[in-house]
Amino acid sequence: MNTASATQTIELKKDQGGQGQGPGYFARRNVWDWLFAVLVIAGASWAFLRYNAAMDGYEKAILVGAVPAMVWLGWFWRPLRALAAVVAAASLLAIWLYQTPAGVADLARADQVFLLKYFISSQSAILWMSMLFFMSTAFYWMGMFKRAGDTFELLGSRLAWVAVALALVGSMVRWYESHQIGPDIGHIPVSNLYEVFVLFCWMTAAFYLYYEDQYRTRGMGAFVMLVVSAAVGFLLWYTVVREAHAIQPLVPALQSWWMKLHVPANFIGYGTFAIAAMLAFAYLIKQSASESRWYKLAPLWLLGVVLCFEPIVFRQSAAESGGSYWFVYFGISALIVGTILFGRRRIAERLPSFEVLDDVMYKAIAVGFAFFTIATVLGALWAAEAWGGYWSWDPKETWALIVWLNYAAWLHMRLMKGLRGTVAAWWALVGLAVTTFAFLGVNMFLSGLHSYGEL
């Protein structure tokens, strides 16, 4: 079902180009489209009236600009409407529960009110997100091997949706909580490693769910959710060892409205690059399904090396926490590699066609490259404001340029030379390694203007 329906989707999209002109864009909107638009406008108006005193001019402009963007997204992909409604309702409920009878917010109620303590305070929601992403990954993988695989994959997909919703609720409530700590502490939750890992998790999952819906196949979820679960694993370790969930004031360099645009754009790029790499890995697994020679199974061994040697990278921090966490991480990583190795034939049967994997890989890289380009330009403008120059060859800037050049070359070869298949897949995997170093490795091993803390 996965391969046939997804391939038909590609063919249908190709055929649509030759059809005649239909009704105009707004003429195609129905009553539910317009109702969603009205609700978005009403919500933004309420937010402006309620919180405009705490906003500067740039933040007000962002709020106004977010209205047409949100309406368009809801019209473009209808499942986002339900997601937006659930996130808004849960976030407003949390804000209401924080209020005392005197009408003043009290963050101590997070330990006193049942719903806040166990479900929708920022930390509770993010912990639920973490558990549900793990469960989603497990169900997707069970779907690879079980006879009733479609049912397990459906459960994995639904759990991923709930996890995305809880991640957004946690982020929204954390934003509110930061403002209640102090007027100078409140900030959009994209300012430190903890917050951006939450951002990475839900953005990556949301983009994958879009591709899953568009191509009508859940066969890619097992691989994409692996990278989300890996990020969640790091997030939990970082939370426990570094107490990173605590809300801290921004360092001066981050007290800029450019951050509100630069960081989300950057992580759309990171998330979609990660999707492309995991689909490239799936492509190589499908390609080597019937291979028995060990040296031809290089993609599997590559995954094993990357996963199993990650504890060595964090060996200093692992020692601080007793090493037990990374020992478990090593064991789970080895189990995953072994499962893929011995079950590759069954996995290949459940994966979509090579054409679908290649097409989604290309589209994910194209989207990521567009947003990463925007983020790089915004970062240059931010640097000019913070440090007086658009470019200083700081290690972070240099590696961002390397990432940009890598994917620019990939897209150039795709569009000009028809790059596809094995070479494209390996290149996408290498691209993820480069991107990961640019994101984490630079902060760990190099120093520069972007070093705002240590792991």
Where are these regions (language model features)?
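Hydrophobic cores of alpha-helical transmembrane segments in multi-pass integral membrane proteins
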Residues: 2-111, 119-247, 254, 261-350, ...
